[in-house]
């Protein structure tokens, strides 16, 4: 069992993702204290302190003031995508372990700065890809490790919404976010797929992005109407990735697409021995005794959580528990920064291919 020493955490960015994921998940852990909150809108930091902070927690408008507090061991970066890199670099250089919300950065140059800072500081860095922690994803990963699928040579990473455009914050702002659904939700599906395949060596990719529905006024959006004039990112994006070993990945992402079969943070993998997907729970398919078979394991029986203080059915809580456990026991986090760097490189390649109309080759 992990040592129950207290880990003091600072939160940088107290908006939607911090309130919806990071702070509630950390709050469940008995050995975590959130002692500092920072936001450029000070009222958000104060509200976060009131709900999740210790009685003597501090609030800041400038993240560098938070980083100057030597008692803080861990920092969670929950800001818009463009600021992920420089805040994370500063936090690592200040001697903090860092969990940065996905994506790692808006491009590979900025992500490389984060990798360099992690190596320079010797501190831990992880990226918030909580989809790996779902029971279905964990099951598929174990089957892959056990060799159930054989050589995985094709996969499809899917993050498709019919009409679920995030209308709050800066999601629609190209400059702040670096893109739309591809970098927002496609990044989860791609990370999940690469992780299950255990393949992080892309050779080249081709991609397309579309701005077909973002100017519509007849929207039917799940989260209220968006402003067409401010919707500067793509509404959908698609990519095809060829890996160095010849395996291929089809990546689909959309906030708005005229389709019914919507799925998010899901993957399908095909190997020489069997296939698997997360389309309806977990499904494993193959041939046995000269007949096709379909296995749908029951992952919902009552049982103990994988980590004390976390709900086994909640990937965000599982992610936070695994992360703090890694800090306390000096082990690797589930998501290694080098893995997240590859995700960023592929996303960047798809965007670049979409701009040029040509394949993008990785060095």
Where are these regions (language model features)?
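Predominantly a Rossmann-like dinucleotide-binding segment in NAD(P)-dependent oxidoreductases
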Residues: 17, 131-231, 357
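Hydrophobic residues in well-ordered beta-strands that form the structural core
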Residues: 18, 61, 100, 125-127, ...
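C-terminal helix-rich "cap/oligomerization" subdomain common to oxidoreductases
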Residues: 1-6, 11, 32, 74-76, ...
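Beta-strand-loop-alpha-helix segment that lines the small-molecule cofactor/substrate pocket
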Residues: 2, 69, 73-81, 85-132, ...
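N-terminal Rossmann-like dinucleotide-binding module
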Residues: 1-53
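Contiguous beta-strand/loop segments that form the cofactor/metal-binding neighborhood of enzyme cores
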Residues: 5, 166, 191-285, 317-332
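Active-site loop of classical SDR/Rossmann-like NAD(P)-dependent oxidoreductases
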Residues: 17, 308-320
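Conserved SAM-binding strand-loop segment of SAM-dependent methyltransferases
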Residues: 56-63
């Amino acid at each position: 069992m992990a040592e129950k020493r207290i880990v003091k955490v600072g939160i940088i960015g107290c908006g939607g993702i911090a309130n919806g994921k990071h702070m509630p998940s950390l709050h469940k852990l008995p050995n975590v204290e959130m002692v500092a909150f920072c936001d450029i809108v000070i009222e958000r930091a104060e509200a976060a302190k009131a709900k999740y902070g210790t009685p003597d927690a501090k609030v800041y408008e400038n993240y560098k003031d938070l980083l100057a507090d030597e008692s803080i061991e861990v920092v969670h970066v929950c800001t818009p995508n463009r600021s992920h890199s420089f805040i994370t670099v500063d936090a690592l250089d200040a001697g903090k372990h860092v969990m940065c919300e996905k994506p790692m950065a808006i491009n590979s140059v900025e992500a490389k700065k984060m990798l360099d800072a992690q190596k320079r500081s010797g501190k831990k860095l992880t990226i918030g890809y909580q989809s790996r922690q779902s029971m279905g994803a964990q099951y598929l990963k174990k089957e892959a490790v056990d060799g159930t699928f054989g050589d995985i040579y094709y996969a499809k990473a899917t993050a498709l919404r019919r009409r679920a455009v995030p209308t709050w914050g800066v999601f629609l702002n190209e400059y702040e976010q670096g893109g739309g659904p591809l970098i927002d939700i496609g990044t989860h599906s791609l990370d999940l797929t690469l992780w299950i395949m255990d393949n992080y060596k892309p050779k080249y990719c081709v991609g397309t992005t579309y701005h077909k529905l973002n100017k519509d006024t007849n929207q039917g959006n799940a989260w209220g109407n968006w402003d067409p004039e401010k919707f500067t990112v793509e509404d959908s994006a698609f990519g095809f990735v060829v890996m160095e070993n010849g395996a291929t990945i089809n990546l689909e992402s959309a906030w708005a697409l005229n389709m019914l079969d919507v799925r998010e943070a899901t993957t399908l993998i095909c190997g020489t021995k069997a296939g698997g997907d997360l389309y309806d729970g977990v499904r494993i398919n193959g041939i046995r005794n000269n007949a096709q078979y379909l296995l749908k394991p029951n992952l919902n029986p009552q049982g103990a959580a994988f980590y004390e203080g976390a709900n086994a059915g909640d990937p965000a809580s599982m992610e936070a528990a695994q992360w703090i456990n890694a800090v306390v026991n000096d082990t690797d986090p589930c998501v290694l920064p080098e893995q997240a760097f590859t995700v960023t490189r592929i996303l960047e390649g798809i965007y670049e291919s979409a701009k040029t109309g040509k394949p993008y080759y990785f060095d």
